[in-house]
């Protein structure tokens, strides 16, 4: 069948398997064009199939020669449904890793469950050398079932103070439109913290510690985002902000524990604003990202997902140039948050309208990045060619 892009707002309803392979290849090519670095040898990535988690896995495997385990919730071919983008990203990563002689193992399922934790620990003990050096926590999910009380919680993208109305980009209609984010109830705030906070990260570390599979000097990093003033209503003062504060508190608790027992470390890393499957559906964010891209590209400091994560790993987590703020957070968003960058973005924000947003922002770049997340808009992929889903269905991550 021929697969064409279908969108609904900030969601892609279709994904292109051949495009996904190109998406992964380009990131691998970037890492291979850079110097190799001394990093961890055995890595577990929770949320490994797209965005920040996938880029991290690519950097560690192809830049530092790490053996990797990825955990992700993705779907394969079902009838005429071509499977999720993350499914194909994972298969493409596997194929490339195998060619380089790199060990790559994937667990597809619910990362929040204790069964998944048990399965991963069993594999580490029996087939992965018995220990891991690094855990990256890069999970984006709207739903979590607490494995302890069995209750299913759903996150809510809402304000915690007042209704927030602001402009955003609708990629489906290619228009800038107003969007309103309502105020969360106390239960919605609690549920968002349960899904997007630090509880599951902590459960993973506790399970791995109990299983005896953490190495001396073990590190763990969870990915987060803060952003500038224009996004504070959503992030800092929203339900996401409450969850991220919980994540930061968890980082401190884990750091104390790991330092004492393993001479290890735990950090939250604040990422640069980028189009990911998670961020594309957040109100206001796509417009901010499009304006930011324009400013950062003009200054020659724009980074895509792979460049950002490669710099984080080579310079900060495993390098000599960590940028750490007073709250003990790694700050690879430091170029985005530069005063000159933010001043120019704010000036554009004040000028942007539904009529001029494509001209005064890097809308084209932001949209291309969004489409490429789902395997579309690559100039060397034939999107009119027939895709044999029956053959592709035989491939497994």
PLM region spans:
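A glycine-rich helix->loop->beta "capping" turn
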Residues: 105, 119-149
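Canonical Rossmann dinucleotide-binding motif of NAD(H)/NADP(H)-dependent dehydrogenases/reductases
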Residues: 29, 34-73, 77
């Amino acid at each position: 069948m021929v697969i064409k892009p279908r969108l609904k707002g900030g969601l892609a309803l279709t994904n292109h398997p051949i495009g996904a392979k190109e998406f992964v290849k380009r990131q691998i090519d970037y890492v291979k064009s850079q110097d190799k670095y001394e990093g961890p040898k055995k890595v577990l990535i929770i949320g490994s199939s797209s965005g920040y988690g996938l880029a991290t896995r690519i950097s560690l495997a192809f830049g530092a020669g790490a053996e990797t385990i990825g955990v992700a919730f993705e779907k394969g071919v079902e009838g005429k449904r071509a499977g999720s983008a993350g499914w194909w990203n994972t298969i493409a990563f596997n194929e490339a890793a195998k060619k380089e002689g790199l060990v790559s193992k994937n667990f597809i399922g619910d990362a929040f469950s204790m069964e998944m934790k048990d399965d991963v620990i069993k594999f580490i003990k029996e087939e992965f050398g018995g220990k891991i050096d690094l855990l990256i926590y890069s999970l984006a999910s709207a739903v979590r079932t607490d494995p302890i009380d069995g209750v299913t919680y759903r996150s809510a993208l809402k304000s915690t103070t007042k209704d927030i109305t602001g402009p955003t980009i609708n990629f489906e209609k290619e228009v800038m439109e107003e969007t309103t984010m309502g105020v969360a109830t106390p239960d919605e705030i609690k549920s968002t913290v349960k899904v997007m906070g630090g509880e599951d990260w902590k459960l993973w570390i506790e399970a791995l510690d109990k299983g005896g599979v953490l190495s001396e000097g073990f590190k763990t990093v969870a990915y987060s985002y803060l952003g500038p003033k224009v996004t504070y209503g959503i992030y800092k003062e929203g339900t996401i902000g409450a969850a991220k504060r919980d994540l930061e508190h968890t980082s401190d608790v884990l750091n104390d524990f790991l330092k004492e027992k393993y001479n290890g470390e735990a950090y939250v890393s604040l990422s640069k604003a980028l189009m990911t499957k998670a961020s594309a559906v957040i109100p206001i964010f796509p417009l901010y990202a499009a304006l930011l891209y324009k400013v950062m590209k003009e200054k020659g400091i724009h980074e895509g997902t792979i460049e950002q994560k490669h710099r984080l790993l080579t310079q900060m987590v495993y390098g000599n140039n960590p940028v750490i703020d007073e709250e003990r957070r790694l700050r690879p968003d430091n170029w985005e948050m530069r005063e000159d960058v933010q001043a120019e973005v704010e000036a554009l924000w004040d000028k942007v309208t539904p009529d001029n947003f494509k001209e005064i922002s890097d809308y084209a770049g932001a949209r291309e990045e969004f489409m490429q997340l789902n395997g579309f808009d690559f100039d060397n992929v034939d999107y009119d060619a027939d895709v044999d889903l029956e053959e592709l269905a035989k491939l497994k991550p």
